[in-house]
Amino acid sequence: MKNRKSKAGNKLNILFTCIGRRVSLLESFRRAARRLKINASFLGTDTTELSPALQLCDRQFGVKPTTHPGYIKQLLSIVKANKVTLLIPTVDLDLKSLSQNKPKFAALGCHVLVSDPAVIDICQDKRKTYKFLHKNNFDTPATASIRTALKNSKSSIVNSKSETRFPLFLKPWDGYAGRGNAVVNNRRELLFYARRIPNPICQELVKGIEYTCDVYVDFGMKVRCVVPRKRIEVRAGEVSKGQVAKNRRIMNEAVTLVEKLGAGPGVITLQLFLTGDDKLKYIEINPRFGGGAPLSIKAGADFPKWILQELTGGKPNIRFDGFKDGLIMLRYDSEVWLGASQ
């Protein structure tokens, strides 16, 4: 990737897609640009103008849904017209299409902060996530199809009498943001939710302390920092209360996992449980900024600063464990006000 030098009159234009509610992430990049004395403009896209983070961008663009066949063409047009040098996805919805079309963006001088298609495929298909983790000896909840859970006595989540061990956890194999997840306590509930959850898979229900890890992979594809944080409280699939927890075992294992996966560059988000019998069980891999990334940034893992430094040819000074342990984040809602007629 060519270095993008930021000089007076040579502004870096950075585009966030599906920006939605990511106000804190946007402002983190703004602060980083100011500290680095980088002349930067921040652009955003969304399907609706009534998007709080979109309204706080320097330039706003309404776009088609990510599933629309013209979505990528529209983004390419925005990138070309505005000389965008960096594109940052913020949700799962367009990761696959952005990854598949990276060469088209690169031809316009735009670096897309997204992993390769094979990595996206593993992360966005939870059946493949399970196979990857299992094959590489990372502990993960036993996973099976609904049919296997009900009928196959050899399944690791049913006993020798072919009776499912309840409770179980159901979720779509292609789901995101906790949508469609359900805990089932008996066979009747299993059948009920299996008919209502799209593309369901069945997993053992894991209990323990839930963690998210923000893993920073530099532009040379090397893991440079891992920040584990406890998920104290979650709302709509996104952490609302969290605490940084400098657990060396989790940090070191996260490095191995992300390197074997080949994810990056940028921030890769891992979700896992530390169980009562001291096992680390991984449940999700999201190759993008997680909703709780502002906690890690505030603790000292300044991902926006590092990204901007690398983008402009710098070499950020990154300490693997250079962040504050124990920092707690408590989130609340705020408002964005739009103009009203007199």
Regions found by a protein language model. Give the residues of each.
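Short catalytic-loop micro-motif centered on adjacent basic/acidic residues
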Residues: 15-16, 86-89, 142, 201-204, ...
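Active-site nucleotide/adenylate-binding loops and adjacent lid/helix of ATP-dependent enzymes
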Residues: 119-209, 219-220, 248-252
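ATP-dependent carboxylate/phosphate-activation module, predominantly the ATP-grasp catalytic core
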Residues: 179-188, 194, 203-263, 267, ...
